[in-house]
Amino acid sequence: MAISPQELTDIAYKISERFEKVNTYYLVLMAKQIKDIGKLEKDNIHRLRQMAIMGNNIDSINSFLSLQTGLALNDIFELYLKSAIEEYKDVAYLYAYRGIKQPKFKENIAIQNYIESVRKLTSNTFENMARTTVIAQSYRDTVDLAIDTVATGIDDYQSVMRRMLIDKAVAGTKVMYASGITRRLDSAARMNILEGVRQINMGVREETGKQYGADGVEIDAHGLCAEDHLPYQGRQYSLRAYEKLNSSLQRPIGTCNCRHGVSYIILGVSPKTYDDSELQKMKDYSNAKIKIRDKECTRYKATQLMRQSETNMRYQQDKIITLKNAGMKYDKEEEKLKQMKKEYYYISKRAELKPRYDKAYVPGYKL
């Protein structure tokens, strides 16, 4: 059976923890150097020496990033293979219906060539991410400010550097794209993992559909679905009808963070995965009104609030780790994290959803 969207999301978070480790390593090394600079007298500040230390640290961070990128790619390729095999198994009965012998998975050349093309694309994407991760300039700006603050003696070192380090903790390690747009490394990794699996699944489904002569599609269905796709999920359409429908949607199926995919079917042969009553239950569940404090929202919207809370808790932990390693007070930050955790738990209980503290995990901190 195909891996569910929720399982894929969970796996993507797990793999992307490798890049969370890189982020933590970067923040810790930078914070420790800022702590050491703060112990120096202005007459003992040697900019070149500090730049050399910074350079060694950046080299170490980049080496660690390269290592974690390689390990992540191994995990991703294993996921691709597992997902592709499950997708291939699921359509064996459609080959049989057409009287076509389904080739062994490894002997289906078209499928293997497609998977290899996605593997190469993914490898290039992650290697480019590693090369374009913005570490050096961010680190240099922080060290420059630390040296200047000590050298001039005008401003309070702890206050100035505390603000700078908090900003760097929230920003984290960033990937810079050719367009100039930046994104946090961990977020970029998760996005690319999920997109890669989506490409694998859709490619296998499309190619097998061609091989056994599919004449329709079924749109996947899942609970807690966005309102704009609720009327269509779980439904079967002819190929032409689906193409017309999808081109009419402002947010087409399978794009813009949509977790839906389509299975290529033979109309009248492929059974519906969900009957109308089951789809209605999913719709009712997603649209159920939830009262959070003095505001009302749908259960689906509550899941979005939870995802944002998980992100905010990760950033807050990054602040605490950074301040702790810089030898600065972080009690207020820890208190705020406790309040964030309570609010997250409150939202989950109001919406009757399971808290996912694993999605707020940051290496080096016990939430």
Predicted features and spans:
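N-terminal leader/targeting and assembly helices and adjacent pre-domain segments
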Residues: 1-163, 276-367
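Acidic, glycine-rich two-metal-ion catalytic cores of nucleic acid-processing enzymes
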Residues: 167, 175-176, 183-280
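Contiguous, non-catalytic segments that form substrate-binding/exosite surfaces or channel walls
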Residues: 122-212
